[in-house]
Amino acid sequence: MNKTELIKAIAQDTELTQVSVSKMLASFEKITTETVAKGDKVQLTGFLNIKPVARQARKGFNPQTQEALEIAPSVGVSVKPGESLKKAAEGLKYEDFAK
C-alpha cells in the first residue's frame, strides 16, 4: 500500500475527506521527524516505536575492491513494530515472502 492508497483507505474508514486525511498524515510525518530530530522517541503503544539510536564505529569493506575501511559512528533511526503489527503478520506464510 502506498501513501495515496493509505489516504483513501483511512478516509473511507473514518468518513473524513481525503484532503483532511492527507493533512493529518503530513502533520504526523512532520511531528515525528521533528521529534526524532530532537533525540526523542515516538511511541504508539502496541503499534509502533520510532526512536533515534547510536551506531558505534565499525570496520567494513568496499565490496568492489575488497579494501577495508572504517565506518564512522553515526545516529540512525530504529522503527520497531508493536504487538498488534506482530500479531497481524503471524498468519502470513513464509513461502509467500521468501525469494
From Swiss-Prot:
Keywords: DNA-binding, Repressor, Transcription, Transcription regulation
Pfam families tied to this protein: Bac_DNA_binding (PF00216)
Cited CDD domains: SPO1_TF1_like
Chain's role: Selectively binds to and inhibits the transcription of hydroxymethyluracil-(hmUra)-containing DNA, such as SP01 DNA, by RNA polymerase in vitro.
GO molecular function list: DNA binding; structural constituent of chromatin
Family: Belongs to the bacterial histone-like protein family.
Gene3D superfamilies xref list: IHF-like DNA-binding proteins (4.10.520.10)
Keyword Repressor: yes
Protein name: Transcription factor 1
Quaternary structure and partners: Homodimer.
UniProt region (May be involved in preference for HM-URA DNA), positions on chain: 52-77, 90-99
DNA-binding region(s), chain positions: 61, 93-94
Top-level taxon of origin: Viruses
